[in-house]
Amino acid sequence: MTSLHLKKFRRIVVKVGSSLLIDSDAGEVRAAWLSALADDIAGLHGEGRDVLIVSSGSIALGRSKLKLPRGPLKLEESQAAAAVGQIALARIWSKVLGDHGIGAGQILVTLQDTEERRRYLNARSTIAKLLDWRAVPVINENDTVATNEIRYGDNDRLAARVATMASADLLILLSDIDGLYDAPPHLNPDAKLIPVVKRVTADIEAMAGSAASELSRGGMQTKIEAAKIATTAGTHMLIASGKIEHPLRAVMDGGRCTWFMTPANPVTARKRWIAGSLEPKGTLTIDAGAVAALRAGKSLLPAGVIRVDGQFARGDAVIVRGPNTHEIGRGLVAYDAVDAEKIKGRSSCDAAQILGISGRAEMIHRDDLVVGGPRGGAG
């Protein structure tokens, strides 16, 4: 499918499940396979693309190192096994990426980190900085503190949330099956692979049977749920086989997979959400120079703010008005109302000294800002 190629995407999230990473019989990492995957990732990285990894495996690795018997684990046993396995998992990814001169940064998240706005922004900022430094974030659910009531439950949906958080334009779910079929292929030899899903409909959801393995918590149903999350937020998704060596290279060479399409890009979808779905908690009035900068696609700096109104927290939506009080746009503010009042009209360097912390240089980053009206003018 020539119109869909990995080279078209600038920021890619790759999800690797436990059943691919760990040899279930030996309880060890599939080293040769992982090395081949790291080669693929290094190739994308070397072309200037941002790559993020969502990796399962901490519980399975911990269970192996602790020599725990097969079978279900109690919650506290899973949490303790994850504590051991997370160290091993981080070391493994650091080694295979380090062999290519790429730094790896471990990020452990919980459900609340994507549901609670301030924690979401903190996680997103960390991911953005790692990518700025050309490191590869390696992300997993923090199974040591997650409970049955407050967890993602599988890394397919976690990967979709991470893709949304990172404004990725492609999510790749490596699986033990090479895509979505119109019937269970292990039961029906005539089952046909569906190469492209333009929209997740009830019929598509009905095709997702139960295909979970002992090591992983995910199946095709969770992958369809992930597709709904990702495509709604503006991220394309594909399911491809991870059982082969160099699975990403295989996709690039036209290998079998299923693409889930999105009608919008991540930035467009995100900005539509900011503009239309969030209730503004306050107002920032800015000078004419800042209006021109915003309409030229720049971020809003503290120096351009002349008035702060309302009670808002970091990450809340605010209205941005020009000096004549006309609305210029809306955005997610990087400081709460108290700190914004302290640093309005000041340089970013002065703002850091005033607050006693080295926070974000921008009052509102351009990725968090929706500007309306024609370019130019004072608003």
Swiss-Prot record:
Location relative to the cell: Cytoplasm
Molecular function terms, GO-annotated: ATP binding; glutamate 5-kinase activity; RNA binding
Question: What EC identifiers does the entry list?
Answer: 2.7.2.11
> Where ATP is bound, by residue?
15, 175-176
Which Pfam families does the UniProt record give? AA_kinase, PUA
Looking up NCBIfam families in the UniProt record yields: proB (TIGR01027)
Domain PUA per the UniProt entry, residue ranges: 281-358
Does the record carry Transcription regulation as a key word?
A: no
Q: What functional role does this protein have?
A: Catalyzes the transfer of a phosphate group to glutamate to form L-glutamate 5-phosphate.
Family statement: Belongs to the glutamate 5-kinase family.
Q: Which gene encodes it?
A: proB
* Chain segments annotated as transmembrane: none
Any keyword Amino-acid biosynthesis?
yes
Instruction: Output the PROSITE patterns linked to this UniProt entry.
Output: GLUTAMATE_5_KINASE (PS00902), PUA (PS50890)
In Swiss-Prot or TrEMBL terms, this protein is called: Glutamate 5-kinase
- Predominant localisation class: cytoplasm
Where on the tree of life does the source sit, at the highest rank?
Bacteria
Keyword annotations of the record: Amino-acid biosynthesis, ATP-binding, Cytoplasm, Kinase, Nucleotide-binding, Proline biosynthesis, Transferase
- Listed InterPro entries: AceGlu_kinase-like_sf, Asp/Glu/Uridylate_kinase, G5K_ProB, Glu/AcGlu_kinase, Glu_5kinase, Glu_5kinase/COase_Synthase, Glutamate_5-kinase_CS, PUA
CDD domains reported in the protein's UniProt record:
AAK_G5K_ProB, PUA_G5K
Task: Give start-end of the signal peptide.
Answer: none
